[in-house]
Structure formats: structure tokens, C-alpha cells
């Protein structure tokens, strides 16, 4: 898996940068983007479509979901309409807006290929049920919005699957419902809280279902209870 990010700005840019990405503005001057876009940044500069620029403050980040919330001080900012990613269906058309390779405010389109994808990339896939699309995503698109045809943000473009390092038709976006839950916790609580079962589980595949005498594979198998957690023997009744 590759994370689409831009390591250097194009030569004609005035300001030298070590990372280049996209984002979108929510109400109350908050901005959402990917964590890997602002990771280790000493200064974050926001450039709008009307060419205004602002220095943004990082309100908080959540590396496990690859999300970051920024804030700028201005009362005249264009905001997006937030949609409901749960209402997306496979085959729906979606549109991405971002700055691939520093080509600002580029638009690409495609369809939702799958929902609830789990990918193994720096453990992010363990916490995010990704939307898979065939929208063209390249370095610089990270953190940018994925819109439905009603103009509502339904995802945050985050990752690609590639053997060459470039777009190959497999792009992954964080569902906006997941992103907004993370953002609300960062803004209101300063951190993200997650539930913890204290057990190791594995997915029940066809082979395991046969071994357990199941008619078809479904559910999960609890393999072990972790030490020093609230779970203990006899806690689970089967």
C-alpha cells in the first residue's frame, strides 16, 4: 500500500515545503485532513481556491485513523456540506477534489467499488472501514474531500494500493461518518477514545468453519483473553 503524499513542491512555487496535501473546511473554522499530511510539520499553511493563505494551528491528530483537525482564524471561510457515508452504495458516482502533484483544485471522478474495506497499512486498516473507489488519487490528494453527486462530503481520500507508487485504480477513502466522530472527539475532548475488549479474535473463514462444524463461515472466533485486562475466565458464556 502507498500513502499518496507529495514530498516537495513544484519548482515554480514560492514557498519550499516537505509535504503537500489537501483538506476541507468545516464550520467554526476547523479543517480536516490526513494525519500523514501534517505529521512532523513545524508550520502548516492553508491555501484557498481564492488564493488567500492562512497559517493553521493543529488542534489534534489521531494517527490510528490517519486524521488531523486544524484551525484557522478568519470569519469568512467557505465550508462544505457533510453527507452520510452510510447511505453510499456500491456503484454510486463520487468526485474527488485535491491538489495532485501540486496541481491545485483538480477534480477527478469514479465510482464506489466497495465498502468496509480493511487494509493492512501501519495498522490504520484495523480502525477504519475504508471506502474503495476507482477515483484517480495521486500524491497531494491526501486529506481532500470525496463528494457524492449532491455535493456532500462522504469521505476523505487517504490511501492508494500501488506497486509502482502511482495510481493504479485502487483508492481508499475514510468514511465521513468515521471522520466526523473522530473530529468531534478531538475538538471536544482533545483525544479519541476507543473501546477495548481485551481479547484476540480471528475471522471465521471457510476452513475454520469446516473445522468447527459450521454450515457457513460467519462471526469471529475468540482465541485468547489478554492478561491484565478486565476479561477473565468464565466471563464469556456460550
Which residue stretches match the model-derived regions?
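Serine-dependent protease modules
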Residues: 1-227
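Single conserved hydrophobic/aromatic residue that forms the stacking wall/gate
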Residues: 228-238
